[in-house]
Amino acid sequence: MSGLFITFEGPEGAGKTTVLQEIKNILTAEGLQVMATREPGGIDIAEQIREVILNENNILMDPKTEALLYAAARRQHLVEKVKPALEQGFIVLCDRFIDSSLAYQGYARGLGIDEVLSINEFAIGDMMPHVTVYFSIDPEEGLKRIYANGSREKNRLDLEKLDFHTKVQEGYQELMKRFPERFHSVDAGQSKDLVVQDVLKVIDEALKKIQL
């Protein structure tokens, strides 16, 4: 695997999706091969699963069903899009990956981080990210951003109460303790330009290590 797999994680409203696109543009302008993608989604089958997962009408969805659907979408996305790009030497920037399942379903939904990790290890094998950038923001501020952004696509997770999003944040904090070697936290409460600068520093360090 000759590429660099970087995932962007964080609670709702952290701004990672916007920053990811800007990072892609900057790295591409520098002459690097970059592919941006997202989860759940990124390819046709996974996008169809995304519609089921995030549909606001699916309020009866069981937490285990939710976790399994995410893992299924992740597997297809990985083998169809992410892995081929890495094999071609691309920098892959992915908006959410395994850690979202661990924080949301494993911790916030109460399924257990280890249990959800087991499901996802079956789905992705040893294809863990090289680097994970965590966008740190107060959950309440993140939700305010969501509802202030009229153009943002609202989904079922946005309808969860603040308590759920606080648990998601706690879940990510637990993951940073478990995987300190790949997690890098940036302050998402800053201006977008400062967040972009901080993320670029993380990526530059990763590029130096692998000399891509």
Swiss-Prot record:
The record's Gene Ontology biological-process terms are: dTDP biosynthetic process; dTTP biosynthetic process; dUDP biosynthetic process
Enzyme Commission number: 2.7.4.9
The superkingdom listed in its UniProt entry is Bacteria
Keywords attached to this entry: ATP-binding, Kinase, Nucleotide biosynthesis, Nucleotide-binding, Transferase
What's a single GO CC term here?
A: cytosol
Signal peptide region = none
| InterPro entries reported for this sequence | P-loop_NTPase, Thymidylate_kin-like_dom, Thymidylate_kin_CS, Thymidylate_kinase
List the catalysed reactions. Answer: dTMP + ATP = dTDP + ADP
**Residues engaged in binding ATP:** 10-17
Establish whether keyword Nucleotide-binding is in the entry. yes
* Molecular-function annotations in GO: ATP binding; dTMP kinase activity
Q: Does the keyword Kinase apply?
A: yes
Q: Which SUPFAM superfamilies match?
A: P-loop containing nucleoside triphosphate hydrolases
Which family does the UniProt entry place this protein in? Belongs to the thymidylate kinase family.
The UniProt entry, under NCBIfam families, shows:
DTMP_kinase
Q: Which HAMAP family does this entry report, sorted A to Z? A: Thymidylate_kinase (MF_00165)
> Tell me, what does this protein do in biology?
Phosphorylation of dTMP to form dTDP in both de novo and salvage pathways of dTTP synthesis.
User: Under what name is this protein listed?
Assistant: Thymidylate kinase
Provide the gene name from the record. Answer: tmk
